[in-house]
């Protein structure tokens, strides 16, 4: 989503519908040309994104490599100092993780990344169509008092998945979960297996 990140940063979200229209037009034209690849626009954008400069500040890359889970906490008013004190005390124990406070540029980068990453699974499916069967997408809500919130799939199910992407809403236990399924597996059957697991956990979907 580096191209999406830069596009929104420099052009703005108000022009996104025009971008999507242009992508759709390019794909329609490409379908009429036998030498053009499937999902032309996605593959073209992914290719051009490799020529773009690094879009994230180094500290975000460091945290990406260091930690599996990341939380964007946006505070205002008196809550800023309250959060600052709480996080300082909580992460005094380094085994619990770490945090950093954003200036305006870092905050913008974090929010743009949050927006751009939402289409990551779709882009991956288009670019790696030979390895990907499809995407299983679930919106789930766990119990409010659920402490074991991170999903652990059984190996026989996990082995059918190339990548898992989780996007959550802090403190309400609502998640959007994208599963990129390996080529050759039945996505409907996999989804049914996942829903059975969610039923056992008392989740809603």
Regions found by a protein language model. Name each.
Residues 3-205:
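Conserved glycine-rich FAD pyrophosphate-binding loop
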